Amino acid sequence: MMTQDTSERERRVVVVTGGGTGIGRAIAGAFAADGERVVLLGRRADVLARAAERLQAEAPNAAVLWHRCDVSVPDEVEGFRQWLLSEVGPTVDVLVNNAGGVSSVPGDAPLREAAAHAWDILGSNLVGTYLMVHALLPHLRRPGGRIINISSIAALRGGGGMYSAAKAGVLGLTYSLAGDLGPEGITVNAVAPGMVLDTEFFGDRMTPEREARTVAQTPMRRPGHPRDIAAAVHYLASDDASFVTGEVLHVNGGWLFGR
């Protein structure tokens, strides 16, 4: 992949939501390795601080910052926007909407509890993506801005109830934004991971038996790792992908059509 040395160009500003752990941290690390100005967002300040310190140590030529923000809360997103303008500057080059997650609710839960769960899943995975785009859209570089949304294999394969619905919504939003923003020189794409180890997503639900079963259904015969997703995002944010928009890059080792 062709890259331009940061000594020969202005460092880009890259915002990564859910940037403190797993896939988000790997994505941030890929851009930090290029010497970019990387901003991590998340809900846990202590996790973000540790991640930023680690990434800064690994990439001393980068500038790694963090800001605590729940992207599903409009006031917090607006607060982040104001902080960004004050501390970083008026232009964002790359926005990676990675924040999200899944939780479960018992099938016999009261309707009010089920509704709260549904709104929480939609908020963290879909509404948060929309709010971040809405808030930062005036500041995205034109032309050359990049928006990359993290969806999931669940958007097409199912599984996870409201999580699947939310991630399918992320794809719909991606397609709509790509059409709207293309004339302004901004590309919008999605990455849909399959099973990715070394993340907080599966937690205790990823037993050795379940992992072995999933790997057996995956043509590449291995699980994914955060670096696999980071490489896909890094490509979509590069000059090599300047004519790629409205696309979904499936990074699942073939699990989508596994046999």
How would you name each of these model-derived features?
Residues 2-6, 102, 234, 245-259:
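Short C-terminal tail/terminal secondary-structure segment
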Residues 152:
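Residue(s) in the substrate-gating loop at a strand-loop-helix junction
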Residues 112-130, 148, 170:
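Catalytic Tyr-X3-Lys loop
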Residues 182, 187, 244-246:
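Short, small/polar-rich loop/turn modules that mediate ligand/substrate recognition or access, typified
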Residues 82-86, 124-142, 178-179, 238:
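Amphipathic alpha-helical dimer-interface segment in Rossmann-like NAD(P)H-dependent oxidoreductases
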Residues 18-22:
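Conserved glycine-rich cofactor-binding loop
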Residues 106-119, 202, 210, 214:
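Substrate-binding pocket helix/loop in short-chain dehydrogenase/reductase
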